């Protein structure tokens, strides 16, 4: 297969939300146009593949990065040839369908260097959305009087992403105690995670998986998180991180790390 675009949408400054959806559709169409060449099509996002799967005998496997329960039920009813996979037990429970197999996400351990000599700062990595808990991480870091590095992309054509950043995050960035980097290559992100004393993850939603959590743990960085979504499946409390119920508990734990 070949890309239908010369550059990834997220790296194209001229890209818009509507162009991204157009190119996503174009890419999926180009794939299914050649479906008979393959034994299996594996889709990592569920919005388009189920519809195209109805026009081929080649089976489609869809890994649910995230999906609403109502949408899953619609796919089950109308596209039985499309086989879903959940990324955590928590996600399967949220969908209310015990028949879905669970296959956890993985990472390339060769890309991540373990570091047992951290520097004096904490980190949070994630999209600039309220659900990731970045504003809460800032508040926790300030209460604990520790330095925090934020790495997270602002999606400028989505008002709620840019608005969240401008209102809840940007006013706190001082370049010293609270630092912010919008974009970094993957290797540099995991390097920064490995240097951090801890990874703060006060989620405000039920995260189906959370790749950054296992990336941080692989780098030797303990994760301090709320026990929401898949976090209890990924983190062994007291061994690979800490599952806590409040900001005050997180502040207290930070003092011990």
Where do the protein language model's features map onto the residues?
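Catalytic cores of nucleotide-sugar-dependent glycosyltransferases that transfer UDP/GDP/TDP-activated
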Residues: 1-257
